[in-house]
């Protein structure tokens, strides 16, 4: 290696390979908006099934609210119904009581991300999805920009990424569902036709209903995780993550069935 060229090669290596990665992901099977645990699980199972999937998260560190456990006590709880997913991701766990298992939140989040990428998913951090591509009354892709551009209020146009299916995994805010309903005057598959808004905490009901609410909420647009709770008006559940994991797997299964 020419030592006088290493500085240039460092920059060129980053720029050229990143450009190639972005170009490869301009036309997707599935675009996942939001980098929380439900979306990451979906990315893993979709990629494992051979679908072309990319996940977009506005934060520098994807993982949603899983990193901090509860009130920065970095432990999380998962019920037995979701333990098979924990095992598939090779996460260490310990039985705490009947039906409940505890694990380290940092290990758990890291494992989800690692496994998703190694299954073939691409994760783009520092990306905000500000809109969707809406063609022939079908959600057909996402409109992306750098997070700092939006935070600074800079007038910079975004880029478009096409996708056969889009997953709203944006958590409590259910941003994609709100945007699609507000801007296009359409009816979502909810009791009101719009985002209902999540209810206050109830662990049992919240865990059941987040999975029940995971579905195609509008042609081309799917919803999972806390976004599913917010859209359908079901309770939040706090730092128990079985429902999040099961929701991610369910939305992946629905899309795999549709596209495969």
Predicted feature descriptions by range:
Residues 1-29, 195, 199-203, 227-232:
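Extreme N-terminal leader/targeting segments of oxidoreductases
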Residues 47-67:
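Glycine-rich FAD pyrophosphate-binding loop
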Residues 168-184:
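Flavin (primarily FAD) binding-site architecture
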Residues 68-92:
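N-terminal glycine-rich dinucleotide-binding loop that anchors FAD/FMN and/or NAD(P) in oxidoreductases
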Residues 231-259:
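A conserved FAD-binding loop/helix module that cradles the flavin
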Residues 85, 90-169:
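Feature captures the FAD/FMN-dependent oxidoreductase FAD-binding
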Residues 25-54, 244, 251-252, 256:
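N-terminal Rossmann-like FAD-binding beta1-loop-alpha1 element of flavoenzymes
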Residues 215-235:
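Short FAD-binding loop at a beta-strand-to-alpha-helix junction that anchors the flavin cofactor
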């Amino acid at each position: 290696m020419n030592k006088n060229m290493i500085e240039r090669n460092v920059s060129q290596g980053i720029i050229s390979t990143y450009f190639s990665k972005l170009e490869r992901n301009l036309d997707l099977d599935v675009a996942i908006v939001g980098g929380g645990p439900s979306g990451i699980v979906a990315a893993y199972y979709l990629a494992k099934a051979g679908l072309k999937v990319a996940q977009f998260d506005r934060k520098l560190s994807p993982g949603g609210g899983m990193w901090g456990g509860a009130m920065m006590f970095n432990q999380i709880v998962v019920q037995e119904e979701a333990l098979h997913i924990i095992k598939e991701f090779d996460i260490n766990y310990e039985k705490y009581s009947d039906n409940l298992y505890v694990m380290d939140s940092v290990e758990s989040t890291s494992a989800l991300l690692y496994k998703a990428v190694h299954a073939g998913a691409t994760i783009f951090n520092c990306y905000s999805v500000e809109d969707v591509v809406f063609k022939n009354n079908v959600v057909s892709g996402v409109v992306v920009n750098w997070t700092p551009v939006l935070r600074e209020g800079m007038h910079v146009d975004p880029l478009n990424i096409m996708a056969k299916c889009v997953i709203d995994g944006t958590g409590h805010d259910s941003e994609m569902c709100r945007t699609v309903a507000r801007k296009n005057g359409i009816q979502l598959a909810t009791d009101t036709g719009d985002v209902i808004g999540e209810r206050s905490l109830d662990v049992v009901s919240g865990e059941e209903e987040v999975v029940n609410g995971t579905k195609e909420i509008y042609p081309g647009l799917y919803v999972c995780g806390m976004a599913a709770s917010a859209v359908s008006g079901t309770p939040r559940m706090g730092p128990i993550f079985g429902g999040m994991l099961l929701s991610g797997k369910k939305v992946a299964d629905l899309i795999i069935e549709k596209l495969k």
